[in-house]
Each structure stands twice: as C-alpha cells, then as structure tokens.
Amino acid sequence: MTECSPTFRLLQLKAALLLMIALIMSPGLVGAETRSSLTDELDILAVEHLDKVQAESVRENSEYCGFFGFDGSGKLAATEPTKGSYFACESDQPPEEFVIVASYHTHGAYSAHYDSEVPSTDDLSADFERHVDGYLSTPAGRVWLTLVEEMVTIQLCGPGCVVPDTTFKPCPSDAPASKYRLNDLKVRENKIVESC
C-alpha cells in the first residue's frame, strides 16, 4: 500500500472528527444495533454501488474493490472499482481530496470450494489494519458491514439484496450467522462441512 500525503491524512482526520461530532450530536447511538442518518445514507450508497459492481464481478469471477467517502465538493461518493483477482483485491489510491470513510469489495462468482458468503479473516484484518469500516457483497447477494470500532461484521441484508450469481447454491448446513467476530470467522474457516 502506498504512503498517503500529509494533506490526505489531514482530510481523513477532518472526516473522522466530523463523524465523531455527528455521533455525539445523535442521542442514543450505541454500536451496531442503532444507526445514525449519516450511516444510513452510507449504507444506502454502499448497497446501490455494490449492486452496480456485482454483475461484472460475477461475470468476470473477480473481486472488485474501492472506497466510499467525501469527494472534493463534500459529497458522499464511491471511487471507481479496481479489478482484483478471483480471491483478492487491492484498491487504487483515491484522489488526494477524497476523504475515505469506508472500503468496499465484492467476492466474485459462486464456487462450492470457497466460503464466499461471509467476510474472510483477511477481509476483517485488512479493515482493522486500515482503521476503516468495510462493506462486502457476496455471490448470493448478501451485503456485510465490518464495524472497526466494535470489531464485528454484521449482515446488513440477506440473499438478493444486490444482484446475485444465478449459479449460487445455498448450503443449509453451513448457513451464515447474522454477525461474526474475527475469532468466530477463524472457527468457521477451520470447520469441515460434510455435505450440502
């Protein structure tokens, strides 16, 4: 990952400060269970944007990734998606005036050999390392949100929330939970599923 300029870091700090002020001004906000209007707006943008990116991600069987944040005019926006491989994606650095508030990526097409319906431990670790929340869409059309402060990932919406891979086959014996912590995902990754 490339080093960010001091100006970019200042813009990130400014966005974080504005977000903290918004959270303080919104009484009753507590963790993942309650959402502020800014977060709701971000969730809506995330689902709409991932819905647009998902079809190409499935067709190309590649992860796509990028960022959500404030553009130079202060508008909440998404960066253009970067194409990755079938198992990873490294986002291009956004313009210097873009203030990152969250990351996003897709999991590509369905595969019976890959647990792509939940974020991976690497997905969570990357968001924790960047100190930025992360959105993920899955082949079934689920959307997940990793909340860095709470160190948890929650399923924002279930199958079909964004355009799904039509070849997706659910595995009832390995159905995703509604939320995971990093250790929960480690257990899931090491679990052997006999059959679907």
Regions found by a protein language model. Name each.
Residues E3-L17:
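Bacterial N-terminal signal peptides that target proteins for export
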